[in-house]
Swiss-Prot record:
Catalyzes DNA synthesis. Acquires processivity by associating with a heterodimeric processivity factor comprised of the viral OPG148 and OPG116 proteins, thereby forming the DNA polymerase holoenzyme. Displays 3'- to 5' exonuclease activity. Might participate in viral DNA recombination. Does not perform OPG116/D4synthesis across an abasic site. Induction: Expressed in the early phase of the viral replicative cycle. Interacts with OPG148. Component of the Uracil-DNA glycosylase(UDG)-OPG148-polymerase complex; OPG148 and OPG116/UDG form a heterodimeric processivity factor that associates with OPG071 to form the processive polymerase holoenzyme. This is DNA polymerase. It comes from Monkeypox virus. The gene is OPG071. Belongs to the DNA polymerase type-B family. It holds the Pfam family DNAP_B_exo_N. Its EC number is 2.7.7.7. Gene3D superfamilies: Helix hairpin bin, Palm domain of DNA polymerase, Ribonuclease H-like superfamily/Ribonuclease H.
């Protein structure tokens, strides 16, 4: 029997079992049940003394136990690490057992199961059926997984089944209550193992009149009275809410491979199950594959107060307790963890994921026709957009113009769509799927058949969006890749933090190397310095800036320095200069490079003036070996990705290489995380110290380098910053570039693992050509050992606000001057949620203007400053006088919470007062909108005081009174503060700011 592993899960009844859900080549689903064990590692001496004897025991052979406590010394008299070798046993017990002096107890039982039996969680196997006992059709029991799964076979493709769903609930206030608000719609996208896709929506007929129901039937809707009458081939079905809920129960109890929702764990599934129980007393019941355990669908929460999120709110996750092998997957939770977005609402996420440049085909009366294909945007983008358009009802044009779809045609490689849209002047616009221009509260207030049918379209679109996002993010292949890499069940891949997912690969490596790492002392936690961030040399750059990144800097630092808790010889500290000088002189004699590396770090305690960590590089340590494995596997999958021919193979290999990248980059963080199995304070701080020296070294050779006559003169000798080696240190290097090229280079910024180098040219093509040659020369002549850099991009018209804040037009390494550059806003107000739309629109306008000025190159920095400030004053005065912009542009949002130090915090007071006077109260954890409002007769106010008192909560019913105005000056001052930080002339900026607002601006720290 050939099977591919799909998912692993446990039952937690009186008799605990581990289950495998697998699929055969013919599409048949097979469940295999295994005994569940707790695992313990003990020495032979302890094993022999156990009474009663262990349930099962496996010899592990001789293993080396190393004490990895850090040795701190004030001189070079460092004691050797404690190390012992003994025969070890792996004990399996069906129930927890207290065993003294057991080791390796930090690893998960499931990881022990996989590794001890030689099973890959996502592998394909030819099962030896003599080790299988049939329980029922499709379910077997196995007591000997090692022999049963002994033959691994090449991967083969299998079909999967999915249920994507969304619901709509009636509400008359702010949020539906399961006790009073019925479900009006449930929409499903059902994909079975044959690949057949069914789209259907159930509409609650109890919210319609009998006349409307009859009209709906006349229009082609199916009306049913019971579950037995359901026809899943029909797109629209009318039924009572009880029938609607029973159909949901029937679908959710099926054993799909995946049930996918967006925030469904916290809302949709919870609402369905609670409403079902309220109206019928029934529950959604899952049964284990052996039919011996039944559990009710229950959503349980995990509150991790130690990992607080935004505004001090505890990080809460929601989980479904099923035992039938289905993976209930919440896209909302997944995207929150994997993407950094301004908003995690479905419309914002879909807008970010599904966009395409569209060409204007025709302009009509308040309507426009757009076409999109492989000529209007990158290959495949129009095709993806067209897929989403099949169920889409609204399209967002140019970021914020929401247009209703009038007609749509899905073409072979794109689309044609007619939108209800004001006439727009340009020929090319960005089209995206954002917020539908509907008000659900108003729709329920005016509810009738037409509205019910409209809502059905919105609901099925949201259900299908779950499918589109599922495919866009490649969740399925990421799940399989994560299971293989982390040695975890597919259902648990996204459940754990990095400190837990690293345990599987670490355990695998320790068993391969026959190593046990132990500590006898309490882990100490001290702060340490992070990566090097350079101060920007200037604000605006008319010349191009080349961006070079170290490839996996911290992983390669760990490999280069052999940084690991067991390779740490010791840490030498000094309390005075004499001690420091003596230690420095003797260190290199006792611990000569390259076998040893000495790393100067910042002292851990205030009474120390120096701290030096010494690592032995003769035998590769656990962390470097782990990282080398990850990086090698990533390189292997990247190579396979390039050679792959099918889209399935490409998706799998891309997910695998990405997974290895993420887990490799997480190792550095885990070295400094006290609860991690990889915790090593000296290794973590040595890693950042070496990283800082590497970025300073690269900056020193590039800052002032010159290219002429086909020769590149680096600005410094090419000396290894850690110890002398046999490399050629001559800074003059022959290039393959034309001899008439004459350029100078200047380092203008750097951050942790990247260097920004200005070239005195505005030619994109030449800049890319030179940067690629620079990359080759740096890797072959400047860098050493396993360090490599990569030319990432050319930044054109770079505007540096401060450290980690900049705006630019990015030309990637694979592009040219004819390519459409990508606008990058890093750390700026355009990417923040606590900034008004007015501010974002204005700052975007002024950055674009600055960028154009830099491109033209006709003005010096003083002229640019004068022109920008003059224009800004005109715009602000005009807006203040006309007061024409809508209130929506000035609304801000904030999360309501109670985690304030002061009991009378004005934010808390604002919400408390609002809740006293409004039936729709703002709950803890909820975002609310507010704006600064003042009396209409207040003149331009220079000196802004007590601005918190002008905050007003904006809800659906709020209207700006004739005696009120927007307190523009608050917004103008914030906007101006950001704009003056883009300009180079501080004197002019201070003068302008004082004239407008009566105070000096705050300049960002360099």
């Amino acid at each position: 029997m050939d099977v591919r592993c799909i998912n692993w899960f446990e039952s937690h009844g009186e008799n605990r079992f581990l289950y495998l859900k697998s699929r055969c080549r013919n599409g048949e689903t097979v469940f295999i049940r295994f005994p569940h064990y707790f695992y313990y590692v003990v020495t032979d001496e302890i094993y022999q003394s156990l009474s009663p004897p262990p349930f099962n025991a496996r010899p592990m052979g001789k293993m080396r136990t190393i004490d990895i406590d850090e040795t701190i010394s004030y001189n070079l008299d460092i004691k050797d690490r404690k190390c012992s070798v003994a025969d070890m046993w792996l004990i399996e017990e069906p129930k927890k057992r207290s065993i003294q002096n057991a080791t390796m107890d930090e690893f998960l039982n499931i990881s022990w199961f996989y590794i001890s039996n030689g099973i890959s969680p996502d592998g394909c196997y030819s099962l030896d059926e003599q080790y299988l006992t049939k329980i029922n059709n499709g379910c077997y029991h196995c007591d000997d997984p090692r022999n049963c799964f002994a033959k691994e076979i090449p991967r083969f493709d299998i079909p999967r089944s999915y249920l994507f769903l969304d619901i709509e609930c009636h509400f008359d206030k702010k949020f539906p209550s399961v006790f009073i608000n019925p479900i009006s719609h449930t929409s499903y996208c059902y994909i079975d193992l044959s690949g057949k896709r069914l789209l259907f929506t159930l509409i609650n007929e109890e919210m319609l009149t009998e006349q409307e129901i009859q009209e709906a039937v006349d229009r082609g809707c199916l009306r049913i009275q019971s579950l037995m009458e359901m026809d899943y081939e029909r797109e629209l079905v009318l039924c009572s809410e009880i029938v609607l809920l029973r159909i949901a129960k029937q679908l959710l109890e099926l054993t799909f491979d995946y049930v996918v929702t967006f925030n469904g764990h916290n809302f949709d599934l919870r609402y369905i199950t609670n409403r079902l129980e309220l109206l019928t007393g029934e529950k959604i019941i899952f049964r284990s594959p052996d039919k011996k355990e039944a559990v009710h669908l229950c959503i349980y929460e995990r509150n991790q107060s130690s990992h607080k999120g935004v505004c001090g709110m505890a990080n809460t996750t929601f989980h479904v307790n099923n035992n039938n092998g289905t993976i209930f997957f919440d896209l909302y939770s997944f995207i929150q963890k994997s993407e950094k977005l301004d908003s995690y609402k479905l419309d914002s996420i879909s807008k970010n994921a599904f966009s395409c440049m569209g060409k204007v085909l025709n302009r009509g009366v308040r309507e426009m026709t757009f076409i999109g294909d492989d000529t209007t945007d990158a290959k495949g983008k129009a095709d993806t957009f067209a897929k989403v358009l099949t169920t889409g009802n609204y399209v967002t044009v140019d970021e914020d113009i929401i247009c209703k779809v009038i007609r749509k045609d899905i073409l072979e490689n794109g689309f044609k769509v007619v939108l209800s849209c004001p006439t727009l002047p340009n020929d090319i616009y960005k089209l995206s799927f954002g917020k539908d221009d509907i008000d659900l509260a108003q729709m329920y207030k005016d509810y009738n058949l037409n509205i019910a049918l409209d809502m059905a379209r919105y609901c099925i679109h949201d259900a299908c969006l779950c499918q589109y996002l599922w495919e866009y993010y490649g969740v399925e292949t990421k799940t399989d890749a994560g299971a293989a890499t982390y040695v975890l069940p597919q259902s648990m891949v996204f459940e754990y933090r990095a400190s837990t997912i690293i345990k599987g690969p670490l355990l695998k490596l320790l068993l391969e190397t026959k190593t046990i790492l132990v500590r006898s002392e309490t882990k100490q936690k001290f702060p340490y310095e992070g990566g090097k961030v350079f101060a920007p040399k200037q604000k605006m750059f008319s010349n191009n800036v080349l961006i070079f990144d170290y490839n996996s800097l911290y992983p390669n630092v760990c490999i280069f320095g052999n940084l690991s808790p067991e390779t740490l010889v010791g840490v030498v500290v000094s309390t005075n200069r004499l001690e420091e000088e003596i230690n420095n002189q003797l260190l290199l004699q006792k611990y000569p490079p390259p076998r040893y590396i000495t790393v100067h770090c910042e002292p851990r305690l205030p009474n120390l003036i120096s701290e030096i960590a010494i690592f032995d590089r003769s035998i590769e340590g656990t962390i470097p070996r782990l990282l080398r494995t990850f990086l090698a596997e990533r390189a292997r999958y990247k190579k396979m990705l390039k050679q792959a021919t099918s889209s399935t193979e490409k998706a799998i290999y891309d997910s695998m290489q990405y997974t290895y990248k993420i887990v490799a980059n997480s190792v550095y963080g885990l070295m400094g995380f006290r609860n991690s199995a990889l915790y090593s304070y000296a290794s973590a701080k040595s890693c950042t110290s070496i990283g800082r020296r590497m970025i300073l070294y690269l900056e020193s050779v590039l800052n002032g380098a010159e290219l002429s006559n086909g020769m590149l003169r680096f600005a410094n000798t090419l000396s290894n910053p850690f110890y002398m080696d046999d490399r050629d240190i001559n800074p003059i290097v022959k290039t393959s570039l034309p001899i008439d090229y004459r350029f100078r280079f200047r380092s203008v910024y750097g951050d942790t693992d990247s260097v920004f180098t200005e070239i005195d040219s505005q030619d994109v093509d030449k800049s890319i050509e030179i940067a690629k040659e620079l990359e080759r020369l740096i890797n072959s002549r400047v860098l050493f050992n396993n360090f490599k850099i990569e030319f990432e991009a050319v930044y054109k018209n770079l505007i540096m606000q401060s450290k980690k804040k900049y705006t630019t037009m990015k030309y990637s390494a694979s592009s040219n001057s004819k390519s459409v550059p990508e606008r990058i806003n890093k750390g700026t107000s355009e990417t923040r949620r606590d900034v008004s739309k007015f501010h974002k629109n204005m700052i975007k306008t002024y950055k674009t203007r600055l960028s154009e000025m830099l491109s033209e190159g006709r003005m010096n920095s003083n002229q640019v400053c004068i022109d920008i400030l003059r224009s800004l004053e005109t715009d602000l005065r005009s807006e203040f006088d006309s007061r024409s912009s809508p209130l929506e542009l000035f609304m801000l949002s904030r999360m309501h919470h109670s985690n304030y130090k002061s009991a009378d915090n004005p934010n808390m007071y604002l919400v408390t007062e609002y809740n006293k006077n409004n039936p729709e109260t703002i709950e803890l954890g909820e975002r609310y909108y507010f704006a600064y409002i003042c009396p209409a007769n207040v003149p331009w106010t220079k000196k802004l005081v007590n601005i918190k008192t002008y905050e007003t909560i904006i809800d659906r019913s709020f209207k700006l009174g004739s005696n009120q105005r927007i307190f523009y000056e608050v917004y103008f001052k914030r906007l101006t503060s950001e704009i003056v930080n883009l300009l180079d002339n501080k004197v002019l900026c201070i003068s302008f700011f004082q004239r407008m607002f009566g105070s000096r601006p705050t300049f960002y720290e360099a």
